[in-house]
Amino acid sequence: MATDYHHGVRVIEINEGSRPIRTVSTAVLGLIATADDADPAAFPLDTPVLVTNVIAAMGKAGKTGTLYRSLSAIAAQTKPLTVVVRVAEGETEAETTTNAVGGVSPDGKYLGAQALLAAQSKLGVKPRILGAPGIDTQAVTNAMASVAQRLRAFVYASAYGCATVTAATAYRGQFGQREVMVIWPDFVNWDTAIDEEASISAVAYAMGLRAKIDEETGWHKTLSNVVVNGPTGLTQDVFFDLQDPATDAGVLNAKEVTTLINMGGYRFWGSRTCEAPGGFFYFENYTRTAQVLADTIAEAHFAFVDLPLHPSLVRDLLESINAKFRDLKRQGYIIDGHAWYDEQYNDKSGLKDGKLAIDYDYTPVPPLENLRFQQRITDRYLADFAARIAA
């Protein structure tokens, strides 16, 4: 011990001070898909599989079901880490929905969408961008939303089975989770399995594009108004006018449905989540900013748990968090943020019991959703007409 008698020199390492905080990885996909002819060794049923090369994985994904075309749509945008859970395609839509919703087997194995919860322990990655392209019925989307809340992830879901704007907006009303974005309609692209154009879930493209934006721009940028690679058309007509809200796109966006437009390339149009009215996380990036900050700050301070609770430890915690906020502000990920120690939440009985509360706030970066130019006609530029001629 340091207090024992010793006639000589001791060196004691002091590992204190603030520590750098690394932002959690966000461009990790969690894909639920069907493919009865997929390689069962590469994609076993109800088992999370880590795909590090989506293009190479397509060779073992089969051609039936949704897996192959979903991977193709993702690969057209970028090549992210993707956790794939293959579920059995039932003889009916209801059976497929049951398989995708999943649950827990008698021996404790997580099934369907629930298998994404096992990705962290089995694969060492946490899916942050979730979707079940082509099989995301209302029940599946609700199951995915529940998983997303536990993973601090975000779900992209189609307005399943909706053929009209009215139906799509009504469908959106079935959800109230900030972790969900509803998309309508779907894309059309070339299907190499049948040598002709066919519809494909826009959700697969949204997942790939979300990962691409995270990698190239950041999680503070919404999905909206970025060119999508691959689509050749839309499954439904969508009337869009940049300057007129009285359009199909305007109605959909007003009801928090992200739609698809073609303006210099196919794009998603809309940044709203399904959060219930009155909430704070109505923009996609507001939700994702909250998720990223929560996990980043919590995981960065795992090493602080069970250390001696000295005032110096609190100072180190605060400096670590505030240094991270300064860095995120400098890079444009947040407007600003600040952490502090509040005595009212840290009375002596709580401190004595080993409890510490650190407060912090932050301001996410709002997307420019509604740009207004105020155009005026004037005759003041005629006042010096003669001088302008002389010039």
Residue map of PLM features:
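Surface-exposed assembly/interface segments
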Residues: 1-391
